[in-house]
A protein has these predicted regions:
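Early extracytoplasmic/lumenal segment of secretory-pathway proteins
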Residues: 37, 46-132
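Conserved C-terminal helix/tail region of periplasmic/extracytoplasmic solute-binding proteins
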Residues: 50-52, 283, 390-427
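Extracytoplasmic ligand-binding site segments that recognize negatively charged/polar headgroups
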Residues: 71-84, 98-108, 124-280
Length: 427
């Protein structure tokens, strides 16, 4: 499949300062029933008739500029977009891809301001969406769609896979397209920990025997780790699926806080403080201050070793009780100026070629959203055997212990309750 086929397929309330809030607070505001009182802006001339063919989409995309709002904090991800994605888009369709640094609450805030003001053409044509942001944007009616069924390369995606079709327990329904799929992994110093703990009991025992050598961050990655543990205390796999259940959460979290309080004195700095984010945790690990770090991307360990962020002896694994697996997505704002061009970009990004390139640890190490069972044999073999993935088990093995993202309310509660039950009690 050449570059052309990658694009075409084989057949041709007012929160204008929202960015000041954390994602958890933003979700809480929406869950409390507070949404923008403004109406969705009138659709612009850039909107496509539902019956438009893919060839018509391609023609409308010619020569346009697509502004993609995405996190720009990783030089290797930026290089993938700049050096590998942008050139063929420009050559094939004259599409100029411009990256705008924006993520999370900042993106939601900018889109909300647009909606409140009735601005028909916004700053973004495409946005990188993670979990809770999709929940917020759907509540705001800020996303264009459904559009994924119009993408030729979407035929390689298994839309029955709940890790694709559901985003934080909410159906995507064609309003965002999966771009990458990852699973949280714990990373250990294989020289100090040649046989890492595989169960919660074994982990607790290891922490007691090696005081000060384990911790987790106080940010998104650490809270995702706690979500994975919460499943075990709630009854195991599938126990937290479905809408938020207050009683179930309280029962499971009480066991989680008891487990954490029991190991807390044996954590790094006696559990009185925690790294603010996973970057700080990686630094502690690299400085040999702790023997474990972690990542929400199972493929990141190889990528970060190549970057020199993590040492050569870093190895990744998953507890037998499982870990959170999720997808990150691309969405088109309802007021995007160039929706057709954005669709062409998304179709390219989910092509087998682009997904394989992105999965390479030397490029990004981001897992594919394509189902190998739906791919031609050539691509099936390539995506099942990623060059350079040597420090983490195969994705097919990790999938057996994958846990779905629970309802977004759980992330809010864990953020709040962890501070009250663990951090403040230690002071």
């Amino acid at each position: 499949m050449g570059v052309s086929s990658m694009f075409r397929g084989e057949n041709a309330c007012s929160f204008t300062a929202l960015g000041l809030f954390s994602p958890a607070v933003v979700i809480a505001l929406f869950l409390s029933g507070c949404t923008s009182e403004s109406t969705t802006p009138e659709l612009s001339d850039s909107d496509l008739p539902e019956q438009a063919t893919w060839d018509e989409v391609i023609r409308k995309a010619q020569g346009k500029t697509v502004h993609i709002g995405m996190w720009d904090g990783d030089p290797m991800i930026n290089a993938y977009i700049r050096d590998w994605v942008a050139p063929p888009l420009l050559k094939e369709h004259g599409i100029t891809l411009q990256q705008i640094g924006s993520q999370g609450a900042a993106t939601v805030s900018r889109l909300m301001v647009d909606l409140e003001s009735g601005r028909s053409t916004g700053d973004f044509d495409l946005v990188w969406i993670n979990g809770e942001n999709f929940f917020q944007l759907r509540k705001m009616q800020a996303l264009y769609g459904p559009f994924t069924d119009r993408l030729p390369n979407s035929r390689y995606i298994d839309w029955k896979n709940p890790f694709i079709a559901m985003d934080f327990q909410q159906r995507v329904d064609g309003y965002e397209c999966p771009w990458g799929n990852v699973q949280q992994a714990i990373i250990c110093n294989s020289e100090h920990v040649p046989d890492p703990p595989r169960t919660l009991d074994q982990l607790a025992a290891w922490i007691h025997q090696h005081p000060g050598r384990f911790t987790f961050d106080n940010g998104f990655t650490g809270m995702t780790f706690l979500k994975s543990l919460l499943y075990e205390f709630a009854g195991g796999r599938d126990s937290l699926n479905g809408p938020f259940d207050e009683a179930r959460y309280l029962a499971a979290s009480a066991k989680l806080w008891a487990w954490l309080r029991e190991i807390q004195p044996h954590l790094w700095r006696q559990g009185e403080t925690f790294p603010e984010n996973v970057a700080q945790l990686h630094q502690l690990f690299s400085n040999d201050e702790v023997d474990f770090t972690m990542s929400n991307n199972d493929g990141e360990v190889d990528n970060k070793v190549l970057q020199g962020v993590l040492p050569e002896h870093a190895k990744a694994f998953v507890l037998e009780s499982g870990s959170i697996r999720n997808s990150h997505y691309l969405g088109i704002p309802v007021n995007a100026a160039n929706k057709a061009a954005a669709m062409v970009v998304v179709n390219f990004l989910i092509s087998p070629e682009a997904q394989l390139q992105k999965a390479m640890p030397a490029v990004w190490g981001d897992g594919t959203v394509l189902s190998t069972e739906l791919l031609p044999e050539e691509w099936k073999n390539k995506l099942e055997h990623i060059d350079g993935r040597t420090r983490v088990p195969p994705r097919s093995e990790l999938e057996r212990s994958a846990l779905m993202e629970p309802a977004p309310e759980i992330m809010i509660r864990l953020n709040e309750d962890f501070r009250r039950e663990i951090i403040e009690r230690a002071r």
